[in-house]
């Protein structure tokens, strides 16, 4: 997005983009679809008749169509007035298609779509329907199956696994290794997956799955949102590097695991599976305990639950740190054994 914000409640998700000149547009995400938006204009087609009329699935600044017309931004050849257009090409009028986009933005959208709709289109090879540098990648698609928290985490952590662009490739043609910006990158700081659960009591509906540090090497942990305080392991992050902090522990793990990727990958994958499994199991147990005997002070109960989740995350993260440190130490360049002499 250029300046994009997602809004959601139990019933709807809307995506709003600022399109410059103090104007905005918003589009309702179809109930059965997902959206991919790298750091560029995302919305592809826009129904101005709906936005300026009923506003069922599209909304915008009252004068946006006038702004587009007056500044000659409509690049369509059909001669339809923007205010009457039902499939206005937003990207052509207001988006970017730069060389930087083609190494920084469109490849990430391409990979997410490729993961979630692997057989809908041809994504690779000379006959591909879409490539990493395509400017017409869909803004939203209906996935081939329901999307899980793990699916979202995977695409937000991805680095072109299974393609020639994977920066960790060691075999085959390496000429394209690392040529595109990954989604899981060294400077990831924070990722949150918001889950709203309409089947739960109001106080338990909101869950935020949180991970910190480089997404390639971290894992999301579920936390209830109706709480009084955040566990210190997550909350008290300062500039001082310490393993007392979930953030810094993840940063240390990533720095070592990246440099020693083949030796450390199995440790990271086992950690991710163990922490994800524990998160689901603990969330289920806490939900069931509440439903069996609803607490008068739900916030206090959920705050205590979050502390247990943080404690579990710390235990598993400390264990990962120990294993990654050992594996990285064994590959230090100053290693030497008597048998080497």
Which residues does each PLM region occupy?
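C-terminus-biased signal that marks the final domain/tail of proteins
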Residues: 2-13, 22-341
